[in-house]
């Protein structure tokens, strides 16, 4: 069935208006990450998060039009879903609350073997910025075009940089050094 007409929207409509109203009252913005939270077979087919695609975001924002509700945007999640990760930056510029700087590598040979309906980790791997398939030049052009001045957070989930404090420091420095070429400030 169409995820846009699922029981999740009834639950969203029941649960979120009060939370968003409280955020408005406190002058706080809520950013829901666009990660499907789909990692294992028990989460298939839809994952554990509603806010995963532009069609769903439109429905959410129609249901709760408050500007206190927005997105914690991570381009990598659209890449592995075979979607354009740049266009939503322009389309949802007024809803971007927080941005994750995380890349992803889609392994075509694994995708060809497992298919798009496999759990996503069967064919992709989270990567540091610059080590995957996100076009960071286009990404930073877009966030510069829309004059985004909110938080940018390096999200390290690259398995090649796990195991020790030195690996973690290396991941952060490698990411920072790559990203610095795009920052206008």
Language-model features and meaning:
Residues 1, 6-8:
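Flexible, glycine-rich active-site loops centered on histidine and acidic residues
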Residues 30-36:
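Short, structured patches in soluble enzyme cores that scaffold and shape functional sites
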Residues 1, 36-38:
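Mobile beta-alpha loop/short-helix "lid" or hinge segments that flank ligand
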Residues 4, 17-21, 25, 29, ...:
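Histidine-acidic metal/acid-base catalytic patches
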